[in-house]
Amino acid sequence: VFGQCGGCAIQEADQETYTQWKTGLVKAALAPLGLSDRVTDFIDAHGTGRRRVTFHARRRDGDIVIGFMRAKSHDVIDLQSCPLLVPQLQDSAFRLKPLARLLLKSDKPIDIAVTATTSGLDVDLRGHGPASPELRMKLTREAEILDLARLSLHGDIIVERRAPQIAIGKASVILPPGCFLQATEAGEAL
């Protein structure tokens, strides 16, 4: 997948090149507001990897593909693993294919937002629309098989087997479905 995925484009850069590139992006965004001179030291917040990810899923040639968009394209790269993710998320795209298979009955793609929590994976499916009672039961069974902490559809909880929690400082916080969370623990600590 390296070199094909839009998110991987800069991963091979040395730290100085990466720092200059990222700082340049921030300065360019702030320049129209006259604030680019206020950008100071670069703080690396990569940490041990991304703890949240949104995969894209669609049907292709009779199969389900789940992964990231190819750089400058709408094509989904079928993902087996990604070195930028925390270990808990490494094989999640592949593992979540049965959920996508239940929802992808047409060519309409869906998104699968996944957060690694201390209780297990918190999964929010997006792009499908309301689920019938029968589909909700099938999704619940699949969540059980996959040992998900929680499964929701556009923030509507299908099943919560364990409250998805993360540590923020000394507190253990239960996340609402589909909420924003800093991508890395190191980024949150800032």
Residue ranges of predicted features:
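Accessory RNA-recognition modules of RNA-modification enzymes
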Residues: 1-190
